[in-house]
C-alpha cells in the first residue's frame, strides 16, 4: 500500500521514493544502510569515492515499519561484501541498534552473507559530514571492520570511534559557501535570511541556509551558514569549507577560530574600528598567518560607527549585508541593492518611515569597505604563546573549548565525573567575551557612593569595592574615602568589568551624579579605550575581600550592593529587565538559596553549558539551582521544600535523642537545643550550625546521633526556597501548579519575571499580555485584559503578594523581596521586566527608566499584601506607588513598538484599545 502511494506521489512531484532506494555503483562491494537526512551527506561521499573508481553504495530506508525484508534485499547489490548500518540512536540494553539488528536478521542464514557492522552517528545533535561517511567506507575496507562504532566523536574511553578524515569540499558544481559570525540581536541572522530570499527569488541558483546559535539571549554568538549553487544542494550539515567569511564582531578574532576551513583564494570581511596598519597590528598572528598561507583577500569596514552615524545603534546587519553582496558578486550589485531595499520595507515598514530610511542609508554605505594588504611575510609568523593562568583544569580543558565553539572536538574523557549532568558553579566568570561596543567609565569626582549603578546592572559587571589599608597598597587605581562609620579608614571604588559588560548603559542612566559637581559619575565610552580596566577588575575581584559583614545588607539599596552577587555574567540580553531581580535575591540570600527554575529565558541564561552564572562566596557557599518544565516548576520547588523539611526533621529527631541521652555532654545538648529553638530563623539556624558542625564532626565516629547530624549538616541552616519563572509559566502553562503550591501554605517564595509575553520563544501572547499590545498570536493587538495574578493570590488571605518594578522604586523592590522571604508561608512577587520584545524606542539601555515610566503613568502599580500585618490589627494591603499621571499613559504606550505598531497598522481601532487599556489599568 505504501509503495503504491509513493508511486502516486512520484507522479505528482517528480521526486522518486521507494520503500528502499539504492544509490551508488551497480557492482558495489561496500554499502551503507541508513535513513533520514544523513543519506544526502552519504550521496556526496559516494560520488567522491566513485570518481576515484571505488565500488561503494548506499541503501536509503524510507519505510522502516513495517520492515519489508523482501524489498530491502531487492535493493541491495548482489556484489556487496561488507555492510555498515547507521543508527541515530543508542540502545545500551540491546545487542545493537534497531536498524542494525533488522539488517542482520535479513541476512541471517543466507549463503555468502556479507560482513555486517553497525555504528551510531549524530547523537547530541552532532553534525554528520561526508568526511565521517568516508571514515565508515574506510572501515568497511579493513579485513576486520570495527563493529559497534561511532562517528563524529572522539571516544577515548570505550574506543568505539572511527578515525576522523579531513574535511573536504564536496558540494555540487558552482557551489558558493559563506559563513557569517554575528552577535545575537545584531540583525545578522535576519539579514542573511533576506539574502537567501533575494538570491533565490531573483536567480536560478539553489539556496540553503543554516543558523547556529549559542544558548545566550541577544548578545550571544551566532553563525550563519549559507550555500548557493547551480545544482540541487545535498549538504545536510553546516558549512565547513567556506569561500567567504564575514566576522561582524572584532572581538571574535581572539575568541573563535573564524578562519577555520576558509578555502584558498577565499575572501574575509571584518567589521572593525581599526584601520590599515593599526588593524594589521591588532590581528592575531594565527589569523594573519592563515591569510598569507591561503592567499585570502581581506576586507574591513567600520559598520559599528556607520550604524551610529545613521542612527541604527548597534544594528550593523544591513551595512554588512550590503558589503557582502558588493564583495562577492553573487548577484549583480544593482539588483542586490534594489532587492535589499524592498526587503527593508517588508521587514521594517511597520516600525515607521524613519527606520526604513535609516536602513536605506545603511545599504548605500555598505560600499565603504577597504582592502587590507596581506604581507607575504606573515606566513612565517609564530603563534602567540598561550596566556598562563591558575584556573582549574576543568575550566581550561572543558569550559574554554566549549566557549570557543570547539566543544565538538572534545574527547569523551573530558566529561569523566560529570556524566550525571552536574556542572561546576561560577563558570560564567571565565568567559570574558568583550562584546560591548561601549562600557561605563567611572568618574570618581562625581560619585556619591549610592551604589544604584550596581543595583540595576543586569550582569553584575559593575560593583562597589571597599578596600582596607592593606588592599589599598596594591591598588593601581583611583579611590575615594569610603562613606560610613563602619568603613572608617577604608577607601571606595566603583569598578567595571569591561569584558563581561554588555554595554546596555542602564548604570549610567540611573546614576544621579553629584549635584554640586553637575555631572554623572558614569559615562559610556568605547570599549577599546577602557580595556586597561580589565586589570583593575582582576585586582579587585581577586584581592579585595567582601565587606558585607560590616553592614546590614538588607537595610537599604546601598548596603545590599556590598554583598557579593552570587548570580553574575549571565547570558541574558543587554539591558535585561529580569536579571537584576535574580541577582538581588542572590545577594541577599544566596549563601542558603535553593532555586527551582521554570523553563524559559530565566532557565536559559541561568544554566546553559558551559556557562553557569550561579556562583559561590568566599566560603564556597552559593545557590543550588535546578531546572524543571513550564508546567510543573512550582510543584518542583514545593518538592524541594518538602524534602528539606523531611531531612531537617531527621536532624531534629537525632538532636532530641541526644538531648535525652545521659551520655551526651552538656555543651552538645545546649547547642542542639539552640538549633531546635531557632531552626526556622535563618540567622539563628546559621549561628547554631557554626557551633554544631565541628562538634558533630568530632564525635560522629562514637555517637550515632552525631553521625546522623553530620551526614545532613548542609541542612542545618534554614534554606531560602525560591521558585522562579516567567509570565508564560506563571500565568498560563504552570498556573495550576502555582495555585496548588500557594494554597499548600508551605514556606516557598515565587518570583514571577513578568515580561508580558513568552520572551524565550520569540514574543508570543500570554495571559499577562496587556490589552492592546501586539504579540505573536495577537497581531492586531490583544483584545482582552491582562490576568491580575497578584489580586487572585490575595484572595487566599494567607499568601504574601507584592508587585514591584525596580526602576520605579528601588527601595520598595528591596523591601518586598525581604518581606516575602521572611514571611513564614507562601509568597508571590511579581516583578515588571522590560524585554527586547517590547520594542522600547529608547532602547534597552533605558529599561530601568521604562519601569519608572510604567509606574508613573499608572500602567503598572506597586503594592504589597502582607497577611502578617492583619495579625497585628493592621491593613495587610499597602499601595506603594503614587497617584498616577494619567495624562502620560498614552505617551508611555507610544514609546513601545508593541503598542505603537497597533496605532500605525490599525489607527481606527488603536484609540479604542488604548483607551480601554488605560481604563483597566
Outline where the language-model segments fall.
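Active-site phosphate/pyrophosphate-binding segments
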Residues: 1-26, 124-195, 200-205, 213, ...
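Ferredoxin-type iron-sulfur electron-transfer modules and their immediate structural context
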Residues: 336-337, 349-500, 508-722, 773, ...
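Short acidic, glycine/serine/threonine-rich loops at helix termini
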Residues: 43-45, 69-71, 94-98, 127-132, ...
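Active-site cofactor/cluster-binding pocket
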Residues: 66-67, 82, 86-97, 172-184, ...
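A structural-propensity feature for long, helix-poor, extended segments
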Residues: 72-91, 211-249, 353, 363, ...
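Thiamine diphosphate
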Residues: 3-152, 160-264, 267-317, 578-584, 588-594, ...
Amino acid at each position: 500500500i505504501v509503495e503504491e502511494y509513493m508511486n502516486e506521489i512520484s507522479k505528482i512531484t517528480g521526486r522518486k521514493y521507494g520503500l528502499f532506494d539504492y544509490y551508488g555503483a551497480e557492482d558495489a562491494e561496500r554499502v551503507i544502510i541508513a535513513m533520514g537526512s544523513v543519506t544526502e551527506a552519504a550521496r556526496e561521499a559516494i560520488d567522491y569515492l566513485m570518481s576515484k573508481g571505488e565500488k561503494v553504495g548506499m541503501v536509503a530506508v524510507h519505510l522502516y515499519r513495517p520492515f519489508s525484508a523482501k524489498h530491502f534485499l531487492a535493493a541491495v547489490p548482489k556484489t556487496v561484501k561488507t555492510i555498515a548500518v547507521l543508527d541515530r540512536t543508542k540502545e545500551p540494553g540491546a545487542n545493537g541498534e534497531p536498524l542494525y539488528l533488522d539488517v542482520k536478521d535479513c541476512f541471517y542464514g543466507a549463503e555468502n552473507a556479507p560482513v555486517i557492522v553497525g555504528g551510531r552517528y549524530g547523537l547530541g545533535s552532532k553534525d554528520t559530514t561526508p568526511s565521517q561517511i568516508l571514515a565508515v567506507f574506510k572501515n568497511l575496507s579493513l579485513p576486520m571492520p570495527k563493529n559497534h562504532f561511532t562517528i563524529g566523536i572522539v571516544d577515548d574511553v570505550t574506543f568505539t570511534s572511527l578515525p576522523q578524515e579531513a574535511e573536504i569540499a564536496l558540494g555540487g558544481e558552482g557551489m558558493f559557501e559563506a559563513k557569517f559570525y554575528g552577535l545575537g540581536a545584531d540583525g545578522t541572522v535576519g539579514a542573511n535570511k533576506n539574502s537567501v530570499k533575494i538570491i533565490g527569488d531573483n536567480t536560478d541558483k539553489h539556496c540553503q541556509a543554516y543558523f547556529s546559535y549559542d544558548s545566550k539571549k541577544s548578545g550571544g554568538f551566532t553563525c550563519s551558514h549559507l550555500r548557493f549553487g547551480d545544482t540541487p544542494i545535498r549538504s545536510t550539515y553546516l558549512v565547513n569549507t567556506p569561500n567567504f567569511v564575514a566576522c561582524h564582531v572584532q572581538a571574535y578574532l581572539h575568541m573563535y577560530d573564524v578562519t577555520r576551513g576558509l578555502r584558498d583564494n577565499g575572501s574575509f570581511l571584518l567589521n572593525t574600528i581599526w584601520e590599515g596598519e593599526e588593524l594589521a597590528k591588532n590581528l592575531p598572528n594565527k589569523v594573519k598567518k592563515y591569510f598569507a598561507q591561503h592567499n585570502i583577500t581581506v576586507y574591513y569596514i567600520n559598520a559599528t560607527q556607520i550604524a551610529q552615524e545613521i542612527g541604527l545603534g548597534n544594528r550593523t546587519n544591513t551595512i554588512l549585508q550590503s558589503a557582502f553582496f558588493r564583495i562577492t558578486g553573487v548577484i549583480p550589485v544593482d539588483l542586490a541593492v534594489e532587492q535589499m531595499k524592498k526587503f527593508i520595507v517588508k521587514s521594517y515598514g511597520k516600525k515607521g518611515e524613519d527606520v526604513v530610511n535609516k536602513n536605506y542609508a545603511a545599504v548605500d554605505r555598505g560600499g565603504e569597505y577597504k582592502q587590507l594588504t596581506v604581507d607575504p611575510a606573515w606566513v612565517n609568523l609564530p603563534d602567540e604563546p598561550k596566556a598562563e593562568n591558575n584556573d582549574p583544569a576543568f575550566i581550561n580543558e572543558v569550559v574554554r573549548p566549549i566557549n570557543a565553539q570547539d566543544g565538538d572536538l572534545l574527547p569523551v574523557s573530558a566529561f569523566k565525573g560529570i556524566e550525571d549532568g552536574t556542572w561546576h558553579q561560577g563558570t560564567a566568570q571565565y568567559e570574558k567575551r568583550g562584546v560591548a561596543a561601549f562600557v561605563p567609565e567611572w568618574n570618581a569626582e562625581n560619585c556619591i557612593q549610592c551604589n544604584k549603578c550596581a543595583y540595576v546592572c543586569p550582569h553584575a559587571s559593575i560593583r562597589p569595592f571597599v578596600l582596607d589599608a592593606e588592599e589599598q597598597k596594591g591598588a593601581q587605581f583611583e579611590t575615594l574615602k569610603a562613606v560610613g562609620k563602619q568603613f572608617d579608614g577604608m577607601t571606595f571604588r566603583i569598578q567595571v568589568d569591561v569584558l563581561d559588560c554588555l554595554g546596555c548603559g542602564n548604570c549610567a542612566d540611573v546614576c544621579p551624579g553629584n549635584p554640586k559637581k553637575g555631572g554623572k559619575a558614569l559615562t559610556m565610552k568605547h570599549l577599546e579605550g577602557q580595556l586597561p580596566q580589565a586589570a583593575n577588575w582582576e585586582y579587585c575581584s581577586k584581592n579585595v575581600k567582601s565587606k558585607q559583614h560590616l553592614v546590614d545588607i538588607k537595610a537599604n539599596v546601598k548596603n545590599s550592593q556590598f554583598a557579593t552577587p552570587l548570580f553574575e555574567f549571565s547570558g541574558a540580553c543587554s539591558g535585561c529587565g529580569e536579571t537584576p531581580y535574580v541577582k538581588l535575591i542572590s545577594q541577599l540570600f544566596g549563601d542558603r538559596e535553593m532555586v527551582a527554575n521554570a523553563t524559559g529565558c530565566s532557565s536559559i541564561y541561568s544554566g546553559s553549558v558551559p556557562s553557569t552564572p550561579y556562583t559561590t562566596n568566599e566560603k564556597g557557599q552559593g545557590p543550588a539551582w535546578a531546572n524543571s518544565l513550564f508546567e510543573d516548576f512550582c510543584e518542583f520547588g514545593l518538592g524541594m521544600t518538602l524534602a528539606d523539611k523531611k531531612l531537617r526533621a531527621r536532624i531534629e529527631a537525632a538532636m532530641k535523642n541526644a538531648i535525652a541521652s545521659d551520655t551526651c555532654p552538656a555543651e552538645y545538648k545546649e547547642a542542639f537545643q539552640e538549633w531546635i529553638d531557632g531552626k526556622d530563623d535563618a540567622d539563628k539556624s546559621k549561628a547554631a550550625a557554626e557551633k554544631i558542625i565541628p562538634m558533630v564532626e568530632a564525635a560522629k565516629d562514637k555517637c550515632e546521633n552525631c553521625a546522623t547530624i553530620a551526614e545532613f549538616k548542609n541542612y542545618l541552616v534554614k534554606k531560602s526556597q525560591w521558585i522562579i519563572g516567567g509570565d508564560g509559566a506563571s500565568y498560563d502553562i504552570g498556573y495550576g501548579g502555582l495555585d496548588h503550591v500557594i494554597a499548600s501554605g508551605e514556606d516557598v517564595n515565587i518570583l514571577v519575571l513578568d515580561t508580558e509575553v513568552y520572551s524565550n520563544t520569540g514574543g508570543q501572547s500570554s495571559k499577562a499580555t496587556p490589552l492592546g499590545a501586539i504579540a505573536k498570536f495577537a497581531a492586531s493587538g490583544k483584545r482582552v485584559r491582562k490576568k491580575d495574578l497578584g489580586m487572585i493570590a490575595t484572595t487566599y488571605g494567607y499568601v504574601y503578594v507584592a508587585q514591584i518594578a525596580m526602576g520605579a522604586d528601588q527601595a520598595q523592590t528591596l523591601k518586598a523581596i525581604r518581606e516575602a522571604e521572611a514571611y513564614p508561608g507562601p509568597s508571590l512577587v511579581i516583578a515588571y521586566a522590560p524585554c527586547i520584545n517590547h520594542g522600547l524606542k529608547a532602547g534597552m539601555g533605558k529599561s530601568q527608566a521604562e519601569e519608572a515610566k510604567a509606574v508613573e503613568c499608572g500602567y503598572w502599580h506597586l503594592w504589597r499584601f502582607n497577611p502578617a500585618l492583619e495579625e497585628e490589627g493592621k491593613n495587610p494591603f499597602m499601595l506603594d506607588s503614587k497617584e498616577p499621571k494619567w495624562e502620560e499613559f498614552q505617551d508611555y504606550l507610544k514609546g513601545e513598538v508593541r503598542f505603537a505598531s497597533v496605532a500605525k497598522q490599525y489607527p481606527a481601532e488603536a484609540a479604542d484599545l488604548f483607551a480601554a487599556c488605560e481604563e483597566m489599568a
